[in-house]
UniProtKB/Swiss-Prot annotation:
Alphabetic keyword roster: ATP-binding, Cell inner membrane, Cell membrane, Ion transport, Membrane, Nucleotide-binding, Potassium, Potassium transport, Transmembrane, Transmembrane helix, Transport
GO CC terms: plasma membrane
Top-level taxonomic group: Bacteria
Subunit structure: The system is composed of three essential subunits: KdpA, KdpB and KdpC.
Record family assignment: Belongs to the KdpC family.
Membrane topology field: Single-pass membrane protein
Transmembrane segments: 7-27
Signal peptide start-end: none
Name of protein: Potassium-transporting ATPase KdpC subunit
GO molecular function: ATP binding; P-type potassium transmembrane transporter activity
Subcellular location: Cell inner membrane
NCBIfam families, per the entry: kdpC, PRK00315.1
InterPro entries reported for this sequence: KdpC
Length: 193
């Protein structure tokens, strides 16, 4: 009986050592050496203080800021520990209420709703944590942000263009705008004037 369990125990210990200790240790050292910013969460600093991550969305609802996608996380928006979509189907009345609520917020902030609203401004993402919006969603908000900041639309559009990332490797994904980075650039541009 002892000879039956010995190989099982040896394989178990070896697999735990390799997959639970050696592999994670090697990947941690590799990540810290080759991609230190990404391995530490792609943190964004302002004035020597961490203000967020380039990978996790934040809630902006003041008219002078660009707004990101809705967050479906609970108990609070953009809760990284509670990542997940709303799973609301297209016929669910709760989705309709959520979209109407966001449209009302856009209207209350002075956004012109005469043009079609980009879908990423009124719906949540699958993760509920998206830090980026489409260039169309950013462009849709330019007039409101420029008016709230007393800046020229052209200056705000230039910042949007400067913070628009293209497709990864030229083919993967869609062009996108990181909302936190864009809002920090807006603050810096306004402070410089």
């Amino acid at each position: 009986m002892k000879s039956l369990f010995r190989p099982l125990i040896v394989v178990f210990v070896v697999l735990v050592a390799v997959t639970g200790l050696a592999y994670p240790a090697v990947m941690t050292v590799f990540g810290q050496a080759v991609f230190p910013a990404q391995a530490n969460g792609s943190l964004i600093e302002k004035g020597g203080r961490v203000v967020g991550s380039a990978l996790i969305g934040q809630q902006f609802d003041a008219p002078q800021y660009f707004w990101g996608r809705l967050s479906a996380t609970s108990p609070m928006p953009y809760n990284a520990a509670g990542s997940g979509g709303s799973n609301l189907g297209p016929l669910n009345p709760a989705l309709k209420d959520q979209v109407k609520s966001r449209l009302d917020a856009l209207k209350a902030a002075g956004t012109d709703l005469s043009q079609p609203v980009p879908v990423d401004l009124v719906t949540a993402s699958a993760s509920g944590l998206d830090p980026e919006i489409s260039p169309a969603a950013a462009d849709y908000q330019v007039a409101r942000v420029a008016r709230a900041r007393k800046m020229a639309d052209a200056d705000v559009r230039r910042l949007v263009a400067d913070h628009t990332s293209g497709r990864q490797f030229g083919v993967l994904g869609e062009p996108r705008v990181n909302v936190l980075k864009l809002n920090l650039a807006l603050d810096a541009a306004q402070a410089a004037h």
